[in-house]
């Protein structure tokens, strides 16, 4: 049975650092008040709660000042070649990075401000979160002849 948003929200109270727990709650409230889908809210919480737990009781999100601190957490998502021959962990790693970047962009640009203060498209990404995504080297399951080019797509989709 899949975990519900309500169940994930209930896990916020178990974050070992009260400051981090409060920040995760505030981010959730921000997402909810801006009409973000429940799935997006849930996915954001599913990343930030484990990240807060990883930081432990003595480190707050405000203490994060280097890429290495974030990379150490992200690298816990890596799997060895035997466990994941297709390197699907890279997709998870990148997904976690997207959500962590969003959180820190919210924290440093929007938290505690009027909802209309700065549009999210103009938020600045803190330098310590400017981490490049990993590229997968998985081979495509499609042959060269099975991939459509632009002209073929336009015959089906007329816009």
Per-region residue spans from a language model:
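Amphipathic alpha-helical repeat elements characteristic of tetratricopeptide repeat
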Residues: 21-25, 71, 150, 154
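A general boundary/transition motif marking the beginning of the first structured unit of a protein
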Residues: 15, 39, 144-145
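Generic alpha-helical segment signature
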Residues: 17-21, 44, 66-67, 146-149
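Long, amphipathic, Lys/Arg-enriched alpha-helical "connector/arm" segment
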Residues: 130-159
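N-terminal DNA-binding module of tyrosine recombinases/phage integrases
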Residues: 1-33
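N-terminal core-binding DNA-recognition domain of tyrosine recombinases/integrases
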Residues: 8, 25-141
């Amino acid at each position: 049975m899949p975990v519900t948003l309500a169940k994930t929200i209930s896990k916020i109270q178990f974050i070992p650092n009260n400051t981090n727990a409060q920040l995760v709650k505030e981010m959730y409230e921000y997402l909810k008040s801006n009409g973000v889908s429940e799935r997006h809210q849930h996915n954001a919480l599913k990343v930030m709660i484990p990240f807060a737990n990883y930081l432990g009781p003595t480190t707050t999100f405000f203490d994060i000042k280097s890429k290495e601190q974030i990379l150490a957490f992200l690298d816990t998502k890596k799997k060895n070649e035997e466990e994941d021959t297709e390197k699907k962990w890279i997709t998870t790693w990148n997904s976690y990075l997207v959500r962590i970047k969003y959180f820190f962009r919210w924290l440093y640009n929007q938290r505690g401000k009027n909802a209309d203060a700065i549009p999210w498209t103009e938020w600045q990404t803190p330098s310590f979160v400017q981490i490049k995504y990993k590229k997968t080297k998985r081979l495509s399951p499609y042959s060269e002849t099975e991939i459509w080019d632009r002209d073929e797509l336009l015959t089906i989709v007329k816009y």
